[in-house]
């Protein structure tokens, strides 16, 4: 929403793998659905192909005619692979060992194209607990491909926010900069997100 507000002529390409968002949900949050294209994707290969095609077409346009554009992938962790889907269809009980390499290859290509087109991209992903770690730690799923390609990696955690009647009215979201080329790595901040029309509390913690 902030990107669209700051760029009145801009648009968002939303790659969606979780089937968790709809046009009505977008409009309820005050986002212009006409400036947001939802693209369902099921596999890493499908996402890579669709994203590259859009960027190639975008790069062919004269630079002065390009409108601001934002890519969003929600989420990387839910993307399958062509091999995994074929194995499921054929009832093969084997682990897909190609996923990490496919992710690394996809973002190796996309990072270059995104940079050339000056198109920012937001990727959501899952984390898991590191087993055997001396101190409790979490790691991002999908291998090292996205970790090395990303300019900024933010880990999010949440706790419930209650009012004076002990009713849950929102979440306190804690953000930790695991990687950043723009700010101090390891820095932590917290913000508050209300479930009602108040939304994100921009004054929380000040």
Kindly give the residue locations of the regions a language model identified.
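Conserved inter-motif catalytic segment of the P-loop NTP-binding fold
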Residues: 7-105
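Walker A/P-loop NTP-binding motif
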Residues: 1-6
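Phosphate-binding/switch region of NTP-binding enzymes
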Residues: 96-205
């Amino acid at each position: 929403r902030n990107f669209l507000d700051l760029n009145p002529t801009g648009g968002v390409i939303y790659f969606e793998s979780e089937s968790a968002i709809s046009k009505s949900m977008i409009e309820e949050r005050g986002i212009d659905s006409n400036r947001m294209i939802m693209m369902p994707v099921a596999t890493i290969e499908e996402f890579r192909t669709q994203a590259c095609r859009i960027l190639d077409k975008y790069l062919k346009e004269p630079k002065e005619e390009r409108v601001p554009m934002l890519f969003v992938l929600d989420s990387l962790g839910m993307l399958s692979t062509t091999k995994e889907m074929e194995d499921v269809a054929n009832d093969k009980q084997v682990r897909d060992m190609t996923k990490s390499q496919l992710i690394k290859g996809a973002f190796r290509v996309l990072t270059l194209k995104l940079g050339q087109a000056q198109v920012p991209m937001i990727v959501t992903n899952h984390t898991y607990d590191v087993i055997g770690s001396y101190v409790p730690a979490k790691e991002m799923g999908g291998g090292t491909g996205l970790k090395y390609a990303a300019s900024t990696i933010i880990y999010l955690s949440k706790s419930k926010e209650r009012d004076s009647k002990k009713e849950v009215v929102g979440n306190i979201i804690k953000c930790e900069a695991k990687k950043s080329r723009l700010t101090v790595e390891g820095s932590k901040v917290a913000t508050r997100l209300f479930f009602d029309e108040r939304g994100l509390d921009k004054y929380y913690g000040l």
